Amino acid sequence: MKMFGECHAHIFLNGRNYKEAVALHKNHVSEEAIRQAFAEYRKRGITFVRDGGDALHVSEYASKIAPQYGIDYRSPMFAIHRKGHYGRIVGCAWEGLEEYRDLVKKVKDLGGDFIKIMTTGILDFATKGHVTSEPLSREEVFAMTAAAHDAGLSVMAHVN
């Protein structure tokens, strides 16, 4: 039997309009939108979804109902980014390593399957493909990865 998977989803997005998607979930998770997304995945034979997390608790809810659709859904619940850098739309910010460790614990407490760290910004095509915001240092990435591993979690990295 073939298995089709989506390996970098954001269940809170709708694939059309970022602002509309955020507004839909801003004050509460839209159960209907999540159920429609899972029904569409199932219709297309997608049985595995790895989400990249969000700041609105949508993937947290989605992780609870995915089995109803026969979907193996994995999520960090939210991504973790350095304060003042890219990542606010998908997660929580940290300033020091202790604060980062607290967020790792929160992911684990929420039932997250892995840690997602934002190591860079995004491509800015208005400036010929430069990457927004300063990337994390090699030492920061190593320390963050070690802290996640110490908590028994693997790491997914956002990199551009």
Predicted regions and their residues:
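Anion (oxyanion) recognition and catalysis
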Residues: 42, 67, 149
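Histidine/acidic residue-rich metal-binding segments in metalloenzymes
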Residues: 98-119, 123-160
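Short, electropositive alpha-helical surface patch
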Residues: 59-74, 132-138, 142
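Metal-associated gating/positioning segment near the N- to mid-region
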Residues: 2-64, 86
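Short amphipathic alpha-helices and their capping/turn segments at secondary-structure boundaries
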Residues: 1-2, 58-67, 97-113
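Active-site beta-loop-alpha junctions enriched in small/polar residues
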Residues: 10, 54-55, 78-87, 120, ...
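Divalent metal-dependent hydrolysis catalytic cores, especially in the metallo-beta-lactamase
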Residues: 31-60, 70-79, 112-125, 154
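Active-site mouth loops of central-metabolism enzymes
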Residues: 18-33, 84-102, 154-160
